[in-house]
Amino acid sequence: MEPAFHAALSRGLAALALPVAPEALPRLERFADRLLAWNRKVNLTTITDPAEVAEKHLVDSLLLLPLLDEVRTLLDLGSGAGLPGVPLACARPALEVTCCDSVAKKVAFVKAVAAELDLPVRAFAVRAEGDPEGEKLPRADAVVSRALSDPERWVPLGVRYLAPGGTLFAMLGREADEARLAAIGAASGLALVDVSRFELPLSRSARAIARWRAR
């Protein structure tokens, strides 16, 4: 991978104080390399500049890392090319990650890269519609989606996949109204824990992550 990738990844991790161990960096680089290689044959991402991949896929995914606390299992719904699930597994190999997406070629990529990197990641080609048993998807300590960024759609769906005492995350690409997020969570029996705000250092793009738990 070219120097711009390494510079963007290092700068993002340092600027945001993300707890990524040095031994995780080769896994993250390999994931990015395989993502771009597969993308030449199948459409996995519109972001192809290596520095942008580092910031907008890897660093953006890893914003969740300090918020996972004692989470042991994570379900990534609508994961696409495994984002954020695979980068999180790269950084925290003890985390058991399940990715699901309705697009078979994206699921095939996630399975292949997880096997190549020896990560505890499972992937299923299924559309999540709120029936974990029927869809054969596990309930998890943490449930997240980058694909569904509208909390009014995401929260009522995601809550159905939470294990008892679990945490639901919404990854938002814009400023978030905490009163609105609290009300959305309350309608699904969840209490808003907090909203963490970030700025990606290269693009200056705003990010917010909302976190809810059962009342």
Swiss-Prot record:
A molecular function GO annotation: rRNA (guanine-N7-)-methyltransferase activity
Catalyzed reactions: guanosine(527) in 16S rRNA + S-adenosyl-L-methionine = N(7)-methylguanosine(527) in 16S rRNA + S-adenosyl-L-homocysteine
Taxonomy, superkingdom: Bacteria
GO CC, alphabetical: cytosol
Record's keyword terms, sorted: Cytoplasm, Methyltransferase, rRNA processing, S-adenosyl-L-methionine, Transferase
Keyword Nucleotide-binding annotated: no
Enzyme class: transferase
Gene3D superfamilies attached to this UniProt entry: Vaccinia Virus protein VP39
InterPro entries attached to this UniProt entry: rRNA_ssu_MeTfrase_G (IPR003682), SAM-dependent_MTases_sf (IPR029063)
Positions with a binding annotation for S-adenosyl-L-methionine: 78, 83, 128-129, 146
Subcellular location field: Cytoplasm
Major location category of this protein: cytoplasm
UniProt-listed Enzyme Commission number(s): 2.1.1.170
A Pfam family annotated for this UniProt entry: GidB
PANTHER family: S-ADENOSYL-L-METHIONINE-DEPENDENT METHYLTRANSFERASES SUPERFAMILY PROTEIN
Alphabetized HAMAP family for the sequence: 16SrRNA_methyltr_G
Recorded family membership: Belongs to the methyltransferase superfamily. RNA methyltransferase RsmG family.
Task of the protein: Specifically methylates the N7 position of guanine in position 527 of 16S rRNA.
Protein name according to UniProt: Ribosomal RNA small subunit methyltransferase G
Species name: Anaeromyxobacter sp. (strain Fw109-5)
